[in-house]
Amino acid sequence: MLKHFKIFFVIISVSSFAEAQTFGFGCLGFVGGYGGFTYQQYEAAGLNDYIRFSNQLENTVDPVDEFNSAMGYRVGLNLFRATFENGIIVTAKGFYQYLSKKNKGTVGVGVNDDNYSMDLTFKNWSIGFDVGWEFTKVVSWKILDGSINFNNVSLTQTTDLPGETIVNKYKSDSGVFGYSIGTGIIVSVIKDYISIEGLAGYTYLVVDNVYNENGTPFLNPVQIPEQAIWTEGKFVESGGFTAVIQLNVGFPLL
């Protein structure tokens, strides 16, 4: 997967450079890096059904909150960013993103109360493009921002018992397909070299289930056979609203 991902990056870079020469704007374009913060909403239907069931058990002292959002960072490369003479901005890019959310609770076993946590993480490699319009020298409108995402989702359950810690880890299939689409604003700090970018949009993501190292699914009706209705939901049923703020740094190709 990563090999094909890198090959695609090279193809985009070469073709974008050729386009720059064809259209003949003042500079042949910029490459650069960026980093920022991401807020992501999602509907973890199956996971939250499991949590609701667990919170109803008699030994629950402090219930675990349900999962509906995560925060984290993204770092990436603008493989090519150029502004045409008519003000249109075109960018080809790739990035890595890490998001996480950790919810805690307490369960009572005998005379002791034990801390319990669930840590949900989203890691993805993405390739994308955007088209914008520079309507002033300082502010540009990112008309359309799109990316294809290859996601890896994991869940870690941790229970702290007296004298020991029990950890159960589950992972999704590798490279679960998803996509993001949005719009935003770019504010130039130093024209073409440094800018601040804000983006809002929607991210599509569906994860059927996650599995431990033995291949046992997390959403398994054997775990709670007396109430297996929660297994009707996918682990992550859908994505949702996404917001990103990032700092871009560019360097001229020539």
Task: Give residue spans per PLM region.
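Sec/Tat signal peptide C-region and signal peptidase I cleavage site
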Residues: S16-A20
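Outer-envelope beta-barrel architecture signal
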Residues: Q21-V31, F84-A92, W125, K137-L144, ...
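Extracellular/periplasm-exposed beta-strand and loop segments of Gram-negative cell-envelope proteins
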Residues: T38-M71, Q97-N124, I148-G178, L205-V244
